[in-house]
């Protein structure tokens, strides 16, 4: 499982170095093969080990294609999906089109989301994290099922 938020640098060629603490798990789960695609809700990218992406792809394939919203989601996620592989130095190349979508420049946040990562522009991530914290702290803002999760 992938956890934590990691500030990493995007180099001039559009490569990111995967933090070493995740590399063994990525190697064992998918031989370092990953898929990156857009997040259909937030202005970030989703980075999946290939084995996880194949599960999502199967669910997308099973959606009823006569519904426009299903086709739209399939086009967005599958149409923007790109195969990636860690190189010998643990780096991977983020395609220019996807970097533009997420507005990734020099400083990037790699955020573990259990079965995947999100890639955020650092400033966008910090603003969202602050807004999320403020929203969840408002009285009555948290649904009962989430209140039960808090330790």
From Swiss-Prot:
GO terms for biological process: negative regulation of DNA-templated transcription initiation. It holds the Pfam family MraZ. Keywords: Cytoplasm, DNA-binding, Repeat, Transcription, Transcription regulation. The keyword Transport does not apply. It is found in: Cytoplasm, Nucleoid. The keyword Repeat applies. PROSITE patterns: SPOVT_ABRB (PS51740). Residues 5-52, 81-124 form the SpoVT-AbrB domain. Its main location: cytoplasm. GO terms for molecular function: DNA-binding transcription factor activity; transcription cis-regulatory region binding. InterPro entries: MraZ, MraZ_C, MraZ_dom, MraZ_N, MraZ_sf, SpoVT-AbrB_dom, SpoVT-AbrB_sf. GO terms for cellular component: cytoplasm; nucleoid. HAMAP family: MraZ. Forms oligomers. Belongs to the MraZ family. This is Transcriptional regulator MraZ. It comes from Pseudomonas syringae pv. tomato (strain ATCC BAA-871 / DC3000).
């Amino acid at each position: 499982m992938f956890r934590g938020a990691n500030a990493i640098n995007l180099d001039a060629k559009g490569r990111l170095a995967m933090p070493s603490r995740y590399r063994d798990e990525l190697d064992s789960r998918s031989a370092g093969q990953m898929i990156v695609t857009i997040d259909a809700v937030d202005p970030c990218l989703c980075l999946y080990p290939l084995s996880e992406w194949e599960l999502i792809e199967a669910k997308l394939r099973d959606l009823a294609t006569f519904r426009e919203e299903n086709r739209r989601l399939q086009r967005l996620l599958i149409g923007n999906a790109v195969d990636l592989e860690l190189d010998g130095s643990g780096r991977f190349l983020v395609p220019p089109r996807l970097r533009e979508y997420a507005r990734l420049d020099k400083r990037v946040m790699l955020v573990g989301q259990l079965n995947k990562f999100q890639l955020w522009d650092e400033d966008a991530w910090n603003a969202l994290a602050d807004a999320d914290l403020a929203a969840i702290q408002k009285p009555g803002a948290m649904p009962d099922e989430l209140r039960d999760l808090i330790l």
